[in-house]
Amino acid sequence: MEYLSKVAKQHILRWIKCRKYFDEYPFSANFAKETHYFDMKTYWVDILTFFCVVILCLFAADVPVKGAIPQKYSVTYFSSQNGVEDGLVNDIIQDHKGLLWFATWNGLYRFDGYNFKNYKSNMEDLGGLTNDRLLDIVEDKFGCIWVLCYDSTCYRFNPDKEVFEPVIQKTANSFRSISVLPNGIVWLLREDGSAVRVVTAPEDLSMTFQFYSSRENTLSTGKIRSVFMDSKLREWLLTDEGVYRLYDSELSIISLSDCRKSEKIPFYFATELEEYIYLGAHQGKVYKYLLTGELSIHTQLPTSASVISILPSVAGLIYVTDSDGFFIHDSLGEIRHVMLDSLSLLKDKTIESAKITCGDLLWLVHPVPGVTLFDLKTQRLSFIEGKDELGRPLNTESDFFAFEDRNDILWVHPKGGGFSYFDSQNRRLIPFNTTEQPVKWKSNDRCFAAFVDKQGNLWMSTQLNRLKRITFIPDKFHIYTPTPQDVELPDNEIRSEERR
């Protein structure tokens, strides 16, 4: 704005000088020759240029700065007056219809943009929800909402019937996670390593349950850690004693090129990259399985740690281990080991999970509060902790999460607390909350959940304010300077152009 003001000032001063000469000399055909300064063409060009500058200020296009958070926003708080009895929200999703769903301590809420509707346990519904404390929710291909409760029970909410439908169980084992696959298959993983595979009929949404465990004789051995589906709709079951593949109702165990048949190898991670399935296993083993054949290629990393994540990046493939940092495998085949020994503030260097976000940022999550950041652009490794009003590390029972909104703003919540946005210019986290206090997160406050909807609104559930919606107001004026080093340069002047 400072540059545009200088441009306008220059033209105003020039116009005043021209007007002065115009008043001193009677107008004639020889006016320009007499003054050696001014002609009518220049006079009107300057007037038109000045008004163009004014119009540009008033009607500048709304072009947000990439990755920059708008300084202005409005906040809407939701409470019992809006139909939300308990605003402590553990999870938020937006379904394929655009409806928002909230997993709360008081059941499931649906928001249609105007009103909230609550669904919770009902004494008259004997087969329905029995615990109103919901932890996680996820939508399947058919629009049903799967719910994991605080007591480790699991239900499917049918939006058409508006009822909770229980999962049939043969045992009372607790569920630990829900895995929804792209083809509509849902896997419910139990704490004991067994699993329930749920097949939904598209015509009436009826469910068929299939049970997988060594106890059911559907697995020869092993406890299921995770489930993955490849692009050919084959399901991979990763266990602590090998890996299985399920296709066309046929379950087979995958043989590995470097292993004896009697050897039991724990597997931790699977992903598809180009024409390969990558599998992370124990003792630094990485397997590449061709989608078109049965060949597996074995890569041995120089570590005895387990490979728990395999992530593509601009630097190459990143192999994250559980106890020995991570490895970068570049396009030339070179493998570089990055250890965490330099992080003196990190008390436990065990890695639980990893995530790569925009800006080439690798985030590592540990058993202790905080998060480790490796910047692939600057090659800088740092450990980040949220701090309270006394400068102490935040230590709330809240997990790490990160997501990017439609304005390219990266939102990050370190484990333990301190919801922030990433400052891409200075490569650091800036704490964010709607409070006007300089310390955004105090010891008596925490962020339970955060989510950005398709309209660009940021939803937050916090200890003090409960559920709130933040609507950012974009800046209307943005200045483009061709040569920012010196605003006085001719390249930066705004002039009107006469076309003949």
Regions found by a protein language model. Give the residues of each.
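Carboxylate-rich, polar loop motifs that coordinate divalent cations or form catalytic acidic clusters
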Residues: 27-500
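Basic, amphipathic alpha-helical segments enriched in Lys/Arg and hydrophobic/aromatic residues
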Residues: 2-25
